[in-house]
């Protein structure tokens, strides 16, 4: 299946990607990466497997267009990554946890889109601010109940010694 496929995406200190079936017959000016086999693979996240250097993973579209996080049926990547310090990893933990509040807020706001549009159309700034305050309070309360993201000791050891892509 993969014989003669090209590594069509190479990003220094991050990953190399292959598996586009169109790359088998592509000329040297072809844009690659869009080929597929007509199916995806359901998301499978196993905590003991993470994006350390050398990890093999199935490629997928971003969460914004792929909320189920399904993987490509044919494309894959190998993590090349780079090394990170413990303080960099600690900062990433903080950023990831802070971003979670925004994600929760946005999820809640999407449920109120009709209401938001009506208030915008009516120039109801007081109503918009009240709804924003309410959603921020709800997002914060929901966030406080969630388990916070934290790198495991194994992840810290790998990312500080051999490297990887901890942001994935």
Identify the meaning behind each predicted range.
Residues 1-168:
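Cyclophilin-like peptidyl-prolyl cis-trans isomerases
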């Amino acid at each position: 299946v993969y014989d003669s496929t090209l590594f069509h995406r190479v990003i220094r200190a991050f990953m190399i990607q292959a598996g586009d079936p169109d790359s088998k017959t592509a000329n040297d000016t072809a844009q690659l990466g869009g080929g597929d086999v007509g199916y995806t693979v359901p998301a499978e996240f196993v905590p003991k497997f993470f994006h350390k250097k050398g990890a093999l993973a199935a490629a997928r579209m971003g969460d914004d267009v792929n909320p189920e996080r399904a993987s490509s049926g044919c494309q894959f990547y190998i993590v090349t990554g780079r090394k990170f310090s413990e303080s960099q990893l600690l900062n990433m933990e903080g950023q990831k946890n802070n971003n979670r509040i925004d994600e929760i807020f946005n999820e809640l706001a999407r449920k109120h889109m009709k209401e938001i549009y009506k208030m915008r159309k009516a120039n109801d700034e007081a109503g918009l601010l009240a709804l924003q305050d309410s959603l921020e309070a709800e997002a914060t309360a929901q966030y406080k109940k969630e388990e916070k993201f934290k790198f495991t000791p194994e992840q810290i050891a790998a990312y500080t010694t051999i490297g990887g892509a901890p942001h994935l």
